[in-house]
Amino acid sequence: MKNILFVTPTTTFDNGAEISIFYLMKYLVSQGYNVFSVCQEIPEPQQDEHRKHYDEVGINAIYLPAAKWWWEDAPGGQPGSKAHRVESYRRNIKEIGGVIEEYSIDLVISNTVNVFQGAVAAKVAGVPHYWLIHEFPEKEFAYYLDK
């Protein structure tokens, strides 16, 4: 295994999940792995800063436009229509599948329970997938109590 793709929950360094995964990716690069990360596309000044940090340590960042990066029930609102979000999810799964194929990805790792696109794309491509879940069952999943 040489090529690993991470699905990153946000295109920031604002939270523990993003910070910890950055250091894991950096470590894997130092061990000779080819590391790729798909993130949600954001406005240029912030995205350029994000890319700079990734470039400095050899992480290949791929930014994808998305109506909503986290799954439908996750926090963050529901921008646009449901049809628009569903189409965006489908497009992102297809794009991630394209990354898996183009770079001969051996393993896909989703870095939060809130991003599902990598799991679906990996399954379709027949590539192993791991989920690094940082959330706790209590409080952080309160939005599921009504379901």
What kind of feature is each model-predicted range?
Residues 21-27:
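Histidine-anchored nucleotide/phosphate-binding helix
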Residues 8-14, 27-83:
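N-terminal strand-loop element at the rim of the active site
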Residues 69-71, 116, 127-146:
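A short, histidine- and acid-enriched strand-loop-helix "catalytic/donor-clamping" loop
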Residues 1-20:
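Nucleotide-activated donor-dependent transferases that construct or modify glycoconjugates
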Residues 17-21, 89-92:
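Conserved donor sugar-nucleotide recognition element shared by glycan-biosynthetic enzymes
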Residues 107-125:
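An aromatic- and histidine-rich active-site surface loop
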Residues 70-107:
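An amphipathic, basic-hydrophobic alpha-helix
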